[in-house]
Amino acid sequence: MKTYLVTGCAGFIGSNFVHYMLEKYEDIRLVNLDKLTYAGNLENLQDIEDDARHIFVQGDICDKALVTDLIAKYDPDYVINFAAESHVDRSIKNPEIFVESNVLGTVNLLQCCKDAWYDAAAKTWKEGKKYLQVSTDEVYGALGAEGYFMETTPLCPHSPYSASKASADMFVKAFHDTYGMPMNITRCSNNYGPYQFPEKLIPLLINNAKQHKTLPVYGDGMQIRDGLYVMDHCKAIDMVANGGKDGEVYNVGGHNERPNIFIVKTVIAQLHDRLKDEGISEELITHVADRLGHDRRYGIDPTKIKEDLGWYPETPFEKGIVLTIDWYLAHPDWMAHVTSGDYQKYYEQMYKNK
């Protein structure tokens, strides 16, 4: 039986990964660590809380004693780090929080893994161990009208968020280059799907449109993103963990490039038709001042992961957006719970008077 220590398990991608793995594998143990900050939600794991293969621990990846104890107690074969502050707008207002979680937290995980897995005298690592860092295409910066990010593209982050993720990636590489730590890094394009906190575009649109609230769009809305359905991403992480070549970086993209304004109008049309609600229309769109340092285009070349591991994105945007909207419409209580209290204060801070 393989054991995974999964950090950030109650967040968007982490919780989807936990569901994916438990559905795919019978003989598995997932030790799931999450601090349960604003975007970490135990409701994301509610349907598996009685599954004996799933062990939840509330805690901080910066807590060296806790992480050390978990590795010693459960002896994980893989440590997969999803834990991160991930919203660019928040990073612009509070960059220090992103340094603590994304950089120092990653370094602590690496050091704890090294302490448990590395024999310094023999300069050898325990067999069958691997650290996997889940990263983002934003570490590469922005693209022009043509071309794609490749694993060899230089890192050129533009926001405090992407700078923190790039720094974490470099520490993972440094532990591999310095100590020989077995590791992989995955860099994904923009994920969407169930359990995504509504500070991100698609769930924000769904939540606002249902209430006939304005739909804020940064600038002209022509920023291009490569949409990746979250379960396709989970499959890629599983394949990299179990088959990725040691020390390699793998780009994970959906080949679903769309301008933000196209996504906005698609969500409006879907909700209008589904709910038969004349109040949901493009008149709700409100263009707001563009984000500082807003990257114009992202696009990933996933050739390497296809050739090395046989992964490919199975979900076109036209299917994925329907699955996503269906999920949010079927889970109104989830949305109501996560948008209460502090979320309203955050929303007003981000979009009021823009």
Describe the function of each predicted region.
Residues 1-191, 241, 323, 331, ...:
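N-terminal Rossmann-like NAD(P)+-binding domain of SDR-like oxidoreductases, especially those catalyzing
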Residues 42-45, 143-146, 196-199, 263-265, ...:
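Short aromatic-enriched loop/helix-cap "lid" or pocket-rim segments at secondary-structure transitions
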Residues 121-123, 141-145, 180, 196, ...:
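Proline-centered turn/helix-capping motifs that create local helix->coil transitions or kinks
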Residues 146, 157-164, 194, 198, ...:
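The catalytic Tyr-centered alpha-helix of NAD(P)H-dependent dehydrogenases
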Residues 36, 190-193, 223-224, 291-292:
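Short histidine/acidic/glycine/proline-rich micro-motifs that form metal-
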Residues 4, 17, 24, 30, ...:
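C-terminal substrate-binding subdomain of Rossmann-fold SDR/epimerase-dehydratase oxidoreductases
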